[in-house]
């Protein structure tokens, strides 16, 4: 198969990502188990300045970018989350339903806490699946990095294209 191009900004273009600091986890006990192996997973807002990992069919609010192992706030580990309004995200289709260009996606079940979503180099990708009902507000498939939309395809998803 021919080499695929990757959807990237034009040379010299500055497209900022929207990165924010959040407390991590549904509760302090869960937060204590989060490690750098969880980077790349899809997250949702669950409280005041707090996110937790998405489960199947959740709306994706962002992607975990970093975990501060020695910094806490209110008993929770702290990390950086890239907001879903940032330009582009890498994702892996982990559900049996295929996707096509511009299909909307939601979270699929992420790997267990402390376990990467995949093997390198695909371990920092969100696990996604096709949304059952489109609403025009979700991340959309804008490029296939590998595969053609079947299970295991690596995708580029975005809210600003399509």
Residue spans for each PLM region:
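Surface-exposed, low-hydrophobicity beta-strand/loop segments enriched in small/polar/acidic residues
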Residues: 1-162
């Amino acid at each position: 198969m021919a080499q695929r191009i990757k959807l990237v900004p034009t040379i010299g273009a500055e497209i900022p990502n929207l990165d924010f600091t959040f407390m991590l986890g549904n509760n302090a006990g869960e937060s204590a188990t989060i490690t750098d192996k969880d980077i790349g997973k899809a997250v949702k807002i669950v409280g005041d300045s707090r996110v937790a990992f998405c489960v199947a069919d959740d709306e994706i609010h962002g992607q975990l970018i970093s975990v501060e192992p020695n910094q806490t706030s209110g008993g929770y580990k702290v990390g950086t989350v890239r907001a879903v309004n940032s330009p582009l995200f890498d994702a892996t289709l982990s559900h049996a339903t295929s996707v096509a260009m511009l299909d909307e996606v939601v979270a699929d079940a992420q790997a267990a806490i402390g376990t990467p979503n995949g093997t390198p180099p695909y371990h920092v990708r969100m696990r996604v699946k096709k949304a059952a009902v489109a609403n025009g507000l979700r991340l959309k498939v804008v490029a296939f990095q590998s595969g053609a939309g079947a299970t295991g395809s690596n995708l580029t998803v975005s809210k600003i294209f399509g």
